[in-house]
Regions:
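Acidic, glycine-enriched active-site microenvironments
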Residues: 1-168
Length: 168
């Protein structure tokens, strides 16, 4: 990962961000943390996206709001931030980090054509989009942590939606 993302050393803390909603309802952002010891579930976070300023279903605005909330006044910083999304989500995340006064390596991972696993495209500031070889072990690791962020976001969204339905 150090070489892939031009990091000064192997990352000890990686934070991965994803959004979940159904047509903008019960919108939620999720952050997972991983490192050499594996997933650090006690560091996972959920971000309720009930902000009236965010248009329901606007994944880009949701990502920016989540990154802003995570890094405003943050004491613990990751070695790299991975965003589940493409170039628009990457740009929103970079803008949020800049507003928070935080400088970190950031990359976005988007599923490839037809959303096929193994054809992911990576986006980084100042670099053209790139892919990794389908048999690259780093690709498998990055898919796994992206999928864990997605799982956590979906599970949290379903739980939030179920609670809302139980109340109504």
């Amino acid at each position: 990962l150090r070489e892939i993302f031009s990091l000064p050393s192997p990352p000890q803390r990686i934070e991965v961000f994803d959004n979940s909603h159904i047509s903008g309802t019960h919108a939620l952002g999720a952050m997972i943390v991983t490192g050499p010891e594996g997933f650090q579930k006690n560091a996972y976070r959920k971000f309720n996206m009930d902000d009236a300023a965010i248009t329901p279903g606007d994944d880009i605005a949701m990502m920016k709001a989540m990154i802003t909330r995570r890094f405003r006044g943050a004491e613990t910083l990751p070695d790299i931030v991975l965003i589940d999304g493409g170039e628009p989500q990457l740009n929103a995340s970079l803008a949020a980090l800049k507003e928070a006064g935080v400088t970190l390596p950031v990359a976005a991972i988007a599923k490839g054509p037809e959303r096929n696993a193994g054809r992911e495209r990576f986006f980084m500031p100042g670099k053209p989009p790139f892919s990794l070889a389908p048999d690259d072990p780093a690709l498998y690791f990055l898919q796994r942590i992206r999928d864990e962020a997605h799982r956590f976001a979906i599970t949290s969204h379903r739980s939030r939606r179920s609670r809302a339905l139980a109340v109504s």
